[in-house]
C-alpha cells in the first residue's frame, strides 16, 4: 500500500463529466489499497473569469492583491467539493479542504506567495480513518489568516509540497499529455515519450519553454527528493517518472530532449565605452524594472568600445528597449538595435557530463541546414543557441535526428 498525492489540472476537472471521470480514476487507486491525497485546480477558464470580474469592478485601478486572492481562491473550492461528493457517491469516503483549512502556511506576498510550512496532522488523521483527502491547489494562508495564492501553476507546487510534507511514495501530475517527450510532438512527429528523466534535466526543460511542469514544482520536488510522475488524465499508461537518479547505460542517449522558446527578443547596444562596470550600467536599470535577462554576449573590445547583446522575453522587449535607449545616452554609446524575430533552441541531457564534442555535434547539425547561430549559452547539462525564428522548427527536427532521438519507424511504415 502506497501513499500517493495526485494533482489534476483545470482541463481534467473542466466539467462535471470530467470530475466524474477523475472520481473513477481515484476510486481505482483506492480500491487497490493506496492512501490518496488529491489536489485540484479550478475548472479550466474559471481563474481567468474571476480575475476579469475583479478587473471589471476595479475600473481603472489594479485589483487589490489581497481581495484578488480571496476571489480567485474560490475556483478551487468548487472543484474540491464536487470531487468529494462524486467520491462519496461511489462509496469512497472523502473530505475536501481549502488551503487554509489544512494550514498550508505561506508568506504574505499576495498573488505570488511561497509555501513556508504545511501542518500535515489533519490530513494524516483523515487518511488513517480511511478517507481520501481532496485539497485545493494554488492557495494557502499567511500568519495573519489572510488567504494567499501561489501564482500561475501553483497547484503543481501544492501537490509537490504536500507530497514532501507527507513523505509520499509518489506525486502524480495528471495533465493533457501522457508524459514528457523528447520534444514537442507537434513539431517533431517522431518525438518519443521518456520513461524517466532527472530533476536536473526536467528543470532545464521547464525553464527553457517546456510547458509540461511548472519550474517551481520541479525545484520543490528536487529539493525534497519527491518522485514525480507525469500522466495523462484520461488515458492509461506509465507516463514519465522524474527522479534524482542518473542511470548510465550503453543504450541511454547523450541528450534527453530538445527544448525551444519562440518568446525571445534580442537587444544590442553598440559602441559602448569599454570601461569597468559598464555591464552593470547597462543591465542594472533593466533588472531594476524587473525585466529578466537571459543570454548575454559582449564582443571583444575594438578602439576602446564594445557591443553588448542580451535577450529578454518578447513581451518585455518594448520596455527594455526604452530603458536601453536612455542608458545609451547616459554612457555615450553609439546606438541601440533590436530583433524580435529570434528563437532559442536548446539540447538538454545529463549525458553531456561524460561525453565530449556534444556542442560541436549540435553546431554541425545546424550548419548542415544552413542555420546561422547568433548567440550561444552553455551549462553542465545544456547548450542553447539563438537563431532566426523562421528556422526554428527545421532546427528542432535536425537536432532531434542528429542526436538519435527519433522514434524507430514501425513495421509497414
UniProtKB/Swiss-Prot annotation:
UniProt keyword annotation of Kinase present: yes
Any one GO biological process: diaminopimelate biosynthetic process
Activation/inhibition comment: Activated by L-lysine, L-methionine, and L-isoleucine. L-threonine, at low concentrations, is a mild activator and has a weak inhibitory effect only at concentrations over 10 mM. Strongly feedback inhibited by the concerted combination of L-lysine and L-threonine and slightly feedback inhibited by the concerted combination of L-threonine and L-methionine. Activated by the combination of L-methionine and L-lysine, L-methionine and L-isoleucine and L-lysine and L-isoleucine.
Keywords: Allosteric enzyme, Amino-acid biosynthesis, ATP-binding, Cytoplasm, Diaminopimelate biosynthesis, Kinase, Lysine biosynthesis, Methionine biosynthesis, Nucleotide-binding, Repeat, Threonine biosynthesis, Transferase
EC category name: transferase
Cellular location(s): Cytoplasm
Record has Nucleotide-binding as a keyword: yes
Molecular functions per Gene Ontology: aspartate kinase activity; ATP binding
Gene3D superfamilies from the UniProt entry: Acetylglutamate kinase-like, VC0802-like
EC annotation from Swiss-Prot or TrEMBL: 2.7.2.4
Domain ACT positions: 267-341, 347-413
Catalytic activity: L-aspartate + ATP = 4-phospho-L-aspartate + ADP
Pathway membership, UniProt: Amino-acid biosynthesis; L-lysine biosynthesis via DAP pathway; (S)-tetrahydrodipicolinate from L-aspartate: step 1/4; Amino-acid biosynthesis; L-methionine biosynthesis via de novo pathway; L-homoserine from L-aspartate: step 1/3; Amino-acid biosynthesis; L-threonine biosynthesis; L-threonine from L-aspartate: step 1/5
Cellular component per GO, a single term: cytosol
Pfam families: AA_kinase (PF00696), ACT (PF01842), ACT_9 (PF22468)
Subunit structure: Homotrimer. In the presence of inhibitory amino acids the Stokes radius of the protein increases, suggesting its oligomeric state may change.
Family per similarity comment: Belongs to the aspartokinase family.
Functional note: Involved in the biosynthesis of L-aspartate-beta-semialdehyde which is a central intermediate in the biosynthesis of different amino acids (L-lysine, L-methionine, L-threonine). Catalyzes the phosphorylation of the beta-carboxyl group of L-aspartate to yield 4-phospho-L-aspartate.
NCBIfam families the UniProt entry points to: asp_kin_monofn, asp_kinases, PRK06635.1-2, PRK06635.1-4
Protein name in the entry: Aspartate kinase
Organism field: Pseudomonas fluorescens (strain SBW25)
